[in-house]
Amino acid sequence: ELEQRERDQVLVQFANRSCSVLVATDVAARGLDIASLAAVINVDVTPDTEVHVHRIGRTGRAGETGLVLNLASMKEMGYVGKIEQLQGRESEWHKLDELTPAGDGPLVPPMVTLHIQGGRKEKIRPGDVLGALTADLGYTREQVGKINVNEWSTYVAVDRAIAAQAASRLNAGRIKGKSVKVRVLED
């Protein structure tokens, strides 16, 4: 069981592409709003068809494409049929032993999230963080990802290759003229 602060940090990391896979319960899945979600994998089929369709709707939003994989037992086929009826299309089926991995290495996310102690209360804005990383420290805009400024803290995604150095340099530097504490959120 995660505390709310830990849950928020995990969700920020996932949304920032600092975490490749997020495993969530049905309760957690209902509260997620993450853009460009490539895939949803269900380890069971929800008996409530509307809830299941809402859950898998987390992928392929706003005209984007996404993949939904349902791991279904024979006992759940009735639920699958109802989902197919609601969506107006049939599912594509594969036996589990026919599936092969796409690669042989681990899923390494391209970004790492930095946690900055300081947020809206300190009048920090996303542009201030971007400016500190690009203009002050010389990183490129392409090396900086999503920036989330909350009341007391800020999260910024940076390219994995520069994460440790960027955190160290931000700790030694300033954002908006103020010293800040920065740490790398661990995978």
Regions found by a protein language model. Give the residues of each.
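Conserved helicase RecA-like core
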Residues: E1-D187
